[in-house]
A protein has these predicted regions:
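Terminal helix-turn-helix DNA-binding modules in bacterial transcription factors
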Residues: 82-118, 144-156
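…primarily DNA-binding HTH/wHTH and HhH modules…
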Residues: 3-28, 32, 36-39, 128-156
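DNA-binding recognition helix and immediately preceding turn/loop
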Residues: 34-87, 107-117
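Short hydrophobic/aromatic patch on the recognition helix
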Residues: 76, 80, 125-126, 130
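Short alpha-helical elements of helix-turn-helix
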Residues: 40-48, 91-98, 123
Length: 156
């Protein structure tokens, strides 16, 4: 008998970088509602701790995460690989790029500000990795995905 462990996706555990979002209720009233930054339980203590850490701290390397948890990088990488199907470094990359996407779609922050907030050493590195992953520059992504009235829809 084989037991399959369901893989956890970035979207399932991602914690928004936004502070509030405009919500319209059934009666048609619109109101800025705070976004819940609590961890959505994944069923894994390791994953929940990792997501909390990535949300609160600007960590760039898997070794930094392993040091924080006082674990060997190899052991932590193996656990994340079992839980997500990807290495710790790949998970961290995709998690940070998800943050970049959200900032691009919902804010007027510059590439330099976004790269700093997402833990990149500079905007060139962020842009290179973004292009490599999504096949377009951050500016092109922003142009294609940010609504005209973004500043009325989101608070960051």
């Amino acid at each position: 008998m084989t037991i399959t462990i369901p893989q956890i996706s970035i979207d399932e555990v991602y914690i928004s970088v936004l502070k509030a979002k405009l919500v319209t209720n059934e009666e048609g009233w619109s109101k800025m509602m705070p976004i819940d930054h609590a961890v959505r339980p994944s069923g894994s203590i390791i994953m929940d701790a990792l997501v909390t850490l990535l949300h609160k701290k600007r960590l760039y390397y898997p070794t930094e995460v392993a040091e924080y948890f006082q674990k060997k990088t190899r052991d932590l990488d193996g656990a994340i690989r079992v839980l997500t199907g990807m290495s710790l470094s790949r998970f961290m990359l995709l998690y940070r790029l998800k943050q970049v996407q959200e900032y691009l779609c919902c804010t007027s922050l510059t590439a330099i500000e976004i790269s700093s907030r997402c833990g990149y050493p500079n905007s060139s590195t962020m842009g290179y990795l973004f292009r490599k992953e999504f096949g377009m520059t951050p500016g092109m992504y922003r142009q294609a995905h940010r609504p005209r009235n973004y500043n009325e829809l989101y608070a960051w």
